[in-house]
């Protein structure tokens, strides 16, 4: 089955159109990294509102992204052991990135001027 997903976000056309309409961002482009990141924030927030998934739960957010909000509600992912395995890998990666960020957060929060003296 051919998908309409492309660009950084790999968003399908109907979902991308919903994003553009709901955010009044009619010029958003799936091949623009900034727009794709804004889309992800929108999608994560909607997933939280629609299915009650924490914005910090990478595993369940991923399953919603892959299966769609209705597919997740129906439990479609429960019939796909491979997908659950991938979602666990996504979650482990998110936890690793969060740990890495904490180790350099202080350095990143310094202004450019103070970085000159580090």
Regions found by a protein language model. Name each.
Residues 56-108:
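Catalytic and substrate-binding regions of cell-wall glycan-acting enzymes that process beta-1,4-linked
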Residues 109-118:
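Low-complexity, Gly/Ser/Thr/Pro-rich intrinsically disordered linker/tail segments
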Residues 6-60, 64-73:
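Alpha-helical segment that forms one wall of the substrate-binding/catalytic cleft
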Residues 1-2:
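Charged, glycine/proline-rich intrinsically disordered loops and linkers
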């Amino acid at each position: 089955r051919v998908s309409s997903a492309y660009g950084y976000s790999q968003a399908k056309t109907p979902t991308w159109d919903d994003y553009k309409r709901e955010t009044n961002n009619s010029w958003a482009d799936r091949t623009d990294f900034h727009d794709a990141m804004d889309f992800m924030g929108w999608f994560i927030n909607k997933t939280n509102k629609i299915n009650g998934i924490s914005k910090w739960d990478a595993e369940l957010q991923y399953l919603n992204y892959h299966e769609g909000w209705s597919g997740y509600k129906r439990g479609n992912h429960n019939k796909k052991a491979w997908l659950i395995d991938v979602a666990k890998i996504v979650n482990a990666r998110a936890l690793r990135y969060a740990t890495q960020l904490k180790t350099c957060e202080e350095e990143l929060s310094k202004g450019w001027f103070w970085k000159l003296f580090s």
